[in-house]
Amino acid sequence: MRLYQIQPREYSMLIFAFSLSGGISAFLAAFYIDSYDRKTVLLTAFFFFALGSILCSFANTYHLMLFARFFTGLFGGLLGGVSTAYISDMVPYERRGKAMGILNLGFGLASIVGIPFAIFICEHMDVFWPFRMIGILSLLTLIPAILYLPKMRDHIPPDTNSIKDIALAIASLVVYPFTYYLFPDLKIKLQSHISKIAEVLQVLKDRNLQNALMFGFFLVLGHFMFISFINPYLVGNLGFKLEDTKWMYIVGGISVSLTSPTIGKFIDTLGKLKSFRILILLSFIPILVISHIHEASIMMALLICAFMFIFNSGRMIAAQTLITGAPSEEQRGKFLVIRSSLIEMSEGFSALIGGLILTRDEVTGHLQNYNYIAYIAVLIGILCIYLASKIEVNSE
């Protein structure tokens, strides 16, 4: 916020731009996601995400950064849904909690290494270097991913159209009245793609999948509404120095890394729904505590944040496992990408709503009304407990 001299509202728009574009692209991808190899889609999106990150590193004005975030989100929005679908296709439902725990272990390690390293770079170089590093490391990661990740094609229908056919059918929509009657081949292909739209609409009409989608949307809404502003809250209200905030991510990341595999096994053993209820209720405690203290030592604040990371991560593992069991194998790709679209939208709206509720005292630098954000997050969490009970498992 200091770099561009912006208020919380403008800061939230940077988050919203990424999430909005990610939500749009993920929803559009739902129409064709099950027609292609998961690996191809995943790595293509990852490549353009890397390019978008490099573009962010050259954004020396607020509006240029806004555009760069929007571009990056177009491809970042696909990664969550496609990677979850990839794992779900590989791992049966009864062992999926452990798999999601291992996936979350990766996020924990990223917090331990990535975020503190980014803060270190910001201190000693400039704030744009982390974006460059993300882009470069992402491009380097593509090499082993291309070589070693297995293809995932079992979900692809035998009558799948080629990319050329899809492009031709989409182009024909522009001159639909002419192509429909003058070119029978295009008419047939267009009808084929309209049937894909019907398949997506069928997913959206399924009551069980509606419950799963709403559950995922509100869970992320409550989580990100609170977590998006934790960093400026620690600096502005609890007196953290900017360089001290890296310890929150180090401690939180280590905590998540140590506990995620165990939590995943716990979820598989106790049951997905019961585990989720326990973990989300426990997550309310650090959320309410951290948002209501006015003074705290760094050690005390870090301890509270560690528990917040552990329980938030745990409830997300349980939620992901519940959600991936809702669709059938044939519906899974479309469903998870639609879910990814809603999650991106949810993240964006959570930041936008938080930016409207929060204000910053120009004299003290304190963020005001953060406790109201915590209350809303808890109420949304209670709603999620109800929605989780409505989800039925239909796939293995």
Task: Describe the role of every protein-language-model region.
Residues 5, 37, 58-64, 293-295:
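Helix-breaking motifs and short loop linkers at transmembrane-helix boundaries and internal kinks
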Residues 19-27, 111-112, 253-261, 348:
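Residue-level signature of mid-helix packing/kink "hotspots" within the transmembrane helices
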Residues 24-60:
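Conserved MFS/SLC helix-loop-helix module at the cytosolic interface between two early adjacent transmembrane helices
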Residues 68-106:
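Cytoplasmic helix-loop-helix junction between adjacent transmembrane helices
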Residues 102-150, 169, 176-179:
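Helix-loop-helix hairpin linking two adjacent transmembrane segments in secondary transporters
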Residues 153-172, 180-213:
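Juxtamembrane intracellular "pre-TM" segments in multi-pass secondary transporters
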Residues 209-249:
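Extracytoplasmic gate region of multi-pass secondary transporters
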Residues 273-318:
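C-terminal transmembrane helical hairpin of 12-TM major facilitator-type secondary transporters
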